[in-house]
């Protein structure tokens, strides 16, 4: 007679479920607070003035911002290229890394489920070039590492040189923010020192090779360059009136990016915008709202549409090829 054996959940399984539940709760809380703050902030906005600011924005500044956005997305492609070199897949050409990067990032961030969508898109592209699911998991981990190293370094720099900028967001004094900046930069430097000689993490069955020190340094440079280009795009779109420096914009921009990422809302919508307006909106907010609208069009909406179309064309072409072969 067969009996059904009931296996009790392990302690690690229960703690994992608790952490997952806590993460969901934090994401919902961030999104709810941000949407409330954004709604409250936008009540006093004169929409006619916002569109007037957009209409009077110099075409050359829009072109410069677009160039900086393109530069940011080009630098993103090196996230994947570095990850491929780290796992020893030097045979994968740059064009494949660029395709995987450019399709996965805008689509995943546009949908909001980055940790779910990005690996699926990367696998669809890399599996046709001989990479396994484990290889793709390694690439996702390493590109995420580049993202966090770049963000934390740039945030540390921005906080150190403009500690007051983020005080409206984290409610900490300028002095505390400067110490936080030092802690962030020391943490990144410590990780760089720890990785200077090749290391593996994970298990014997599933080892994950960390990049060596020089590659980690390159990851940091690429990550900061990517974020710096994006922050500069926002900077040039803000009219001269608010008189906001590049370091405050960098600090608030990265804080807004990280909070938007943590909220899992599509393109950080609501969260990114509220953080940006609260962090920089001491005066008239109409110029900032105008800059936000133009930036979102350039950095989020158009790349999302283009990446979605490109991925659809690639998948359609491959499907057509399979039909011909059969």
Set out the residue ranges of the language-model regions:
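Predominantly cytoplasmic-facing regulatory/coupling regions of multi-pass membrane proteins
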Residues: 1-102, 151, 160-261, 283-326
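Generic hydrophobic, aliphatic-rich segments that mediate packing or membrane embedding
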Residues: 50, 79-83, 98-103, 118-122, ...
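Transmembrane helix boundary and interhelical junction motifs in multipass membrane proteins
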Residues: 74-80, 112-122, 229, 247, ...
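Helix-loop junctions at the membrane interface of multi-pass solute transporters
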Residues: 85-87, 123-130, 279-281
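Hydrophobic alpha-helical transmembrane segments of multi-pass membrane transport proteins
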Residues: 94-128, 260-263
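Membrane-interface alpha-helices at helix entry/exit sites of multi-pass transporters
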Residues: 95-99, 114-117, 128-144, 284-295
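Mid-bilayer segments of alpha-helical transmembrane spans in multi-pass integral membrane proteins
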Residues: 105-114, 144-156
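Hydrophobic alpha-helical membrane segments of integral membrane proteins
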Residues: 125, 137-140, 145, 152-156, ...
